[in-house]
UniProtKB/Swiss-Prot annotation:
Cofactor note: Reduced FMN (FMNH(2)).
Binding site for FMN: R125, S126, S127, N238, A239, G278, K293, P294, T295, S296, S297, R319
InterPro entries: Chorismate_synth (IPR000453), Chorismate_synth_AroC_sf (IPR035904), Chorismate_synthase_CS (IPR020541)
Keywords: Amino-acid biosynthesis, Aromatic amino acid biosynthesis, FAD, Flavoprotein, FMN, Lyase, NADP
Cofactor(s) needed: FMNH2
SUPFAM superfamilies, per the entry: Chorismate synthase, AroC
Gene name for this UniProt entry: aroC
GO CC annotation terms, alphabetical: cytosol
Protein name in UniProt: Chorismate synthase
Organism: Enterobacter sp. (strain 638)
One Pfam short name: Chorismate_synt
Function: This reaction introduces a second double bond into the aromatic ring system.
Pathway annotation from the record: Metabolic intermediate biosynthesis; chorismate biosynthesis; chorismate from D-erythrose 4-phosphate and phosphoenolpyruvate: step 7/7
Catalytic activity annotation: 5-O-(1-carboxyvinyl)-3-phosphoshikimate = chorismate + phosphate
Amino acid sequence: MAGNSIGQLFRVTTFGESHGLALGCIVDGVPPGIELTEADLQHDLDRRRPGTSRYTTQRREPDQVKILSGVFEGRTTGTSIGLLIENTDQRSQDYGAIKDVFRPGHADYTYEQKFGFRDYRGGGRSSARETAMRVAAGAIAKKYLAQKFGIVIRGCLTQMGDIPLAIKDWDLVEQNPFFCADADKIDALDELMRALKKEGDSIGAKVTVIADGVPPGLGEPVFDRLDADIAHAMMSINAVKGVEIGDGFEVVALRGSQNRDEITAQGFQSNHAGGILGGISSGQQIVANIALKPTSSITVPGHTINRAGEEVEMITKGRHDPCVGIRAVPIAEAMLAIVLMDHFLRQRAQNADVIPPLPRW
């Protein structure tokens, strides 16, 4: 099965299934000498892990990461870093009823069509449980980027259903279960989530992730543009159905005189491009938005077919998130960090001697 790796020089390969013994990943390309402990990775894993609030799946996994290789005496050795998280709270019996039934909106049907066989327990490899390893790998990238270049990567929920959320206070994001930066909307989100749980339904969301401090010059023309790689990484996250860089689809309604980011001796006057021009970072904030569909794992009855092709009614049992966008925040941060780390190493490999002729604002 191909498609389990991302990155060229900073390369992350994950393995494992939702109800398997463990999840794991191999991280190649980590520079030597970085101080690294399991605690450095655990913070973001705790932000992503299930069972931390009444608004997310009640599957309770400690998600304690183990560093198996690539670190000696608290420092990276430059060799492959092996990471492992054991699964401890599987309830595979919850999925016995769907062994021969395809859940609508899930990957059951497509995995069966592709492989002729599937692990039906919690979605197997297609489950968002896999993203725990991306978050662990992304934490390595985030630490390196912050220490070496002062880059800060942050994300937050910016819409749930029809409730738009402003980015007002980054400090608030870690103080509420929604990863929301808009204190005025938290009560509305709470009310919506309570209603969804009562109805047995779910809702979509938008997540915004921003990188501050990225220097100009990252990105490879033409097929490895920075924004193309970011979009690729974000689209690989479960339930993501759309990605915007900068103003995204809003540029359709703008004129060129409005959309272009004019430059003065003091710097750029706007950032409609989201910090990327011609596929290369401009030195401004990198801004990406992702749209996540509402999960199809709901108790509202729906129509589907079984393996015999017969029409059946489907009610999904198990433990699921009413809004998968909430826990997607640390995942999106991790994917942006992985892409930026990869492009930093690629830029250093080819253009280490280049001295930018223009100032960086």
